[in-house]
Amino acid sequence: MYADSGPDPLPDDQVCLVVEVFRMLADATRVQVLWSLADREMSVNELAEQVGKPAPSVSQHLAKLRMARLVRTRRDGTTIFYRLENEHVRQLVIDAVFNAEHAGPGIPRHHRAAGGLQSVAKASATKDVG
């Protein structure tokens, strides 16, 4: 009936993995941890200070994120450093935060960042000209 009916359905096992990723994102502390790791690796103590939670609590969240393959570790002596698993996780976190900013009032913060409004204005001007 339709030439292009959209993407094929996802296999059940892949859907389960996607659901697990979203389940991990459904916790405010884990979102703060992932956001903190978007641009650099950090130790548990650094993350605990950054998100304002006790280190044992952050450590438990990190264990869940690691099991879900959203973060990975690197040991340096007795210190374990955490970072996002890959660029896809980083992009997922950034996109989720930016999408949430669009739900609020006014201009989203990421559009106000250095060059943000200018970039939006240039894109708009290009559309008007073209």
Curated annotation (Swiss-Prot):
Keywords: DNA-binding, Repressor, Transcription, Transcription regulation
Gene label: kmtR
Keyword Oxidoreductase: no
Function: Represses expression of Rv2025c and its own expression. Acts by binding to the promoter regions.
HTH arsR-type domain mapped to chain residues: 10-104
Miscellaneous field: KmtR has tighter affinities for nickel and cobalt than NmtR.
Region (Disordered): 110-130
Induction or repression: Negatively autoregulated.
Listed name of the protein: HTH-type transcriptional regulator KmtR
Stated consequence of mutating residue 101 to Q: No change in activity. Lack of regulation by metal ions
Residue ranges of the annotated DNA-binding region, renumbered to this chain: 44-67
Effect of residue 111 to Q: No change in activity. Lack of regulation by metal ions
Cited InterPro entries: ArsR-like_HTH, HTH_ArsR_DNA-bd_dom, Metal_resp_trans_reg, WH-like_DNA-bd_sf, WH_DNA-bd_sf
Activity-regulation annotation: Binding to DNA is inhibited by nickel and cobalt ions.
BP GO terms, sorted: response to cobalt ion; response to nickel cation
GO terms assigned for molecular function: DNA binding; DNA-binding transcription factor activity
Gene3D superfamilies: Winged helix-like DNA-binding domain superfamily/Winged helix DNA-binding domain
Keyword Ribonucleoprotein: no
